[in-house]
A protein has these predicted regions:
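Short, charged/polar connector segments at secondary-structure boundaries
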Residues: 1-86, 97, 103
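Amphipathic, charge-rich alpha-helical segments that serve as recognition/docking helices
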Residues: 71-160
């Protein structure tokens, strides 16, 4: 199997913006503070993944994977962050975001539901494809898509 050489670059934090595609919307401040302390003490263990922004954008790069590490690096007072820059369209970037976020144990069910629903309702992927890509059962994916379609007022109550 062929492997690609991956180049890790040092990118100024000021040149990076979070992605509006990121299904993760909540970040625990205490956890970010702990990660910032760890980064100060030990450095960044894993580089973040970026993609270039379209010409004319205020920032040069958009976060694909690693927004939590990005936020913690800012809290740690760093100027630069180690990153891998990939050439990804919206579909591939969104899929990478979902895959990375599902590796966490504390995935918010509503964020996961919104991400699955977006892939499905945009016509981007079928349930079977989402399940295969994420290593989940089709019934699990369907239940999350259904969760995303519950009454908006109920979602608001759950998030409070």
């Amino acid at each position: 199997m062929a492997t690609k050489n991956i180049t890790v670059r040092n990118i100024p934090l000021a040149d990076i913006q979070p992605s509006t595609l990121n299904p993760r919307k909540t970040f625990d401040q205490d956890s970010l503070n702990e990660l910032a302390e760890s980064i100060k003490e030990n450095g960044l263990v894993q580089p973040i993944t970026l993609r270039k922004t379209p010409k004319g954008s205020e920032k040069h790069f958009e976060i694909v994977c690693g927004e939590r590490r990005y936020r913690a690096s800012i809290l740690a007072g760093l100027d630069n962050i180690q990153a891998v820059v990939k050439d990804l369209d919206d579909k591939k970037a969104f899929a990478a975001m979902i895959i990375e976020n599902l590796q966490r144990k504390d995935v918010d069910p509503m964020e996961e539901a919104a991400a699955f629903s977006k892939l499905f309702t945009d016509g981007t992927m079928k349930v079977k494809e989402i399940a295969k890509m994420l290593g989940k059962s089709q019934s699990y994916v369907i239940s999350r898509i259904n969760l995303a379609n519950i009454i908006p007022q109920f979602v608001e109550l759950m998030n409070d």
